[in-house]
């Protein structure tokens, strides 16, 4: 299953000039890879906040459009908080001493792993590097920055 990060959803739904290049990447991906996109409640919480912040609207149309996708476009993993905490702690133990991993990135990845994700859809290089370190595919591919972060994650202490 493909699993989307907040910045992927932002590129899908928010029509601002700064996101145009990302939007083209997202649209091309979905034409080539149709099917459901996995989301977690963690991503959904951040997306709700970001959509209002970017649009300046208390209840943005983009949020309504995303919610309409729960009738077949998106799969919202029910998420078990105890399992999420356990998986996040596992990732912290494995990588926090290797590189400065973000707490939120780690929790997003933990939720993707628990949801059965095979591919992470994101524009965040650190999150994608962490996903690759855990055996997930990523799209778009890692940049030089992401590959450098991945090398830090793979160092042996």
List where the protein language model places each region.
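Acidic, PIN/NYN-like endoribonuclease modules and their adjacent C-terminal/linker elements
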Residues: 1, 76, 115-157
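Short, well-structured N-terminal submotif of metal-dependent ribonuclease cores
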Residues: 1-42, 54-65, 134, 149-150, ...
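Short beta-strand scaffold positions
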Residues: 4, 38-39, 79, 103, ...
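Acidic, metal-associated active-site segment
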Residues: 6, 102-119, 126
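Alpha-helix N-cap/helix-start capping motif
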Residues: 7, 41, 82, 124-125
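Hydrophobic/aromatic ligand-binding patch that stacks against planar heteroaromatic rings
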Residues: 29, 111, 130
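Acidic catalytic patch
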Residues: 71-97, 106
């Amino acid at each position: 299953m493909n699993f989307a990060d907040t910045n992927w959803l932002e590129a899908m739904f928010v029509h601002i000039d700064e996101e145009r290049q990302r939007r083209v990447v997202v649209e091309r991906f979905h034409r080539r890879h149709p099917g459901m996109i996995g989301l977690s409640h963690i991503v959904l919480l951040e997306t709700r906040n970001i959509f209002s912040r970017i649009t300046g609207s208390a209840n943005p149309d983009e949020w309504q459009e995303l919610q309409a996708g729960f009738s077949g476009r998106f799969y919202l993993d029910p998420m078990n908080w105890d399992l999420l905490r356990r998986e996040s702690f596992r990732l912290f133990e494995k990588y926090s001493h290797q590189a400065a991993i973000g707490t939120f990135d780690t929790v997003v990845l933990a939720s993707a792993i628990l949801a059965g994700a095979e591919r992470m859809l994101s524009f965040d290089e650190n999150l994608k590097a962490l996903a690759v370190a855990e055996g997930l595919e990523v799209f778009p591919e890692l940049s030089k920055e992401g590959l450098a972060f991945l090398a830090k994650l793979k160092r042996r202490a």
